[in-house]
């Protein structure tokens, strides 16, 4: 189950509070794929790790990226990193050894109903090349719109 978590600061939208998510989650045994679109992910990583997350994805544009990726790994959860449409691909390089998933945003995060941004197709090609250059077993890439 993919869960978007938005704080209204990092992105304009907000999602339900964690305590509400916890209530809903008790009705399923499915593992979560958590996408944290928040300024400070460290506050939420532990909470979602304890909610049976399989993946937790943070943004390369957020705070304390390396520290937060290591925290995700500490819980034996697959770590993902998302990149916004306007962010340069080279920003991912320092984190490639720490991630299992790269999420390419094909819209501006935090708003629904947007049209696909065609320029993100080139970003996928760039990231694929980057993975080949910097890491033998690259992370999985997915696109979100």
Q: How does the language model describe each region?
A:
Residues 2-71:
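N-terminal active-site wall of soluble small-molecule enzyme domains
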